[in-house]
Regions:
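Short hydrophobic beta-strand that contains or immediately precedes a catalytic carboxylate
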Residues: 10-17
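Conserved acidic functional residues
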Residues: 1-2, 12
């Protein structure tokens, strides 16, 4: 949900782990200090391994498009990322990537440039973009560099516009709730 002048509105069904890292940290804190909420935690979920699960999600997306080519750099992008509600999570993901040996940055999508077949921020090439934009199809002119790099397959974007169109576009909920179409 996003808040605008008309109040909260559904804009997507998440295709990424948005909010998951913050929730994992909160769950670990609750588990460590609060026996009274222990009943709320599934025994088969290892909070200690959740970061590995999150990282595996990004690596699987990378490998699906790049095979065994090594992933070196990740850009976590949004418009004005420091102003976003989940900005602390962006930083947590950046730290996770760096702990695993990847160069990682949190950057405003408008600061990206596409030059000579490579998406870059300043002088640094970007291999994978963790896309937190709500411009799901990258149609806004300010995201032109990312759109061109993505359509040329010069960067891996996750989640990518096609994933949103297939799995997360809220307009699909109409179809999913139409008994006649589902019959």
């Amino acid at each position: 949900f996003h808040l605008d002048a008309q109040g909260p509105r559904l804009i997507e069904v998440n295709t990424n782990a948005g909010g998951a890292m913050l929730n994992a940290i909160l769950a670990r804190a609750n588990q460590a200090c609060c026996e009274s909420v222990e009943w709320a935690f599934q025994r088969n979920v290892s909070l200690a391994r959740l970061e590995d699960t999150f990282l595996a999600m990004f690596l699987a997306e990378w490998r699906s498009q790049r095979g065994e080519q090594p992933l070196r750099s990740v850009a976590i992008i949004d418009d004005q990322p420091g102003e976003q509600y989940l900005a602390p999570e962006f930083e947590l993901f950046r730290q996770l990537f760096e702990r695993r040996g990847l160069r990682a940055i949190v950057v405003d999508a408008t600061e990206l440039i596409y030059l000579d077949g490579q998406l870059r921020h300043a002088d640094q090439p970007i291999d994978l973009v963790y896309n937190r934009l709500t411009d799901f199809d990258l149609s806004e002119p300010r995201h032109e560099a990312l759109l061109h790099a993505f359509t040329a397959a010069d960067v891996v974007v996750t989640p990518h516009p096609r994933a949103h169109a297939l799995h997360a576009d809220k307009r699909n909920l109409v179809t999913l709730s139409d008994d006649a179409l589902l019959a």
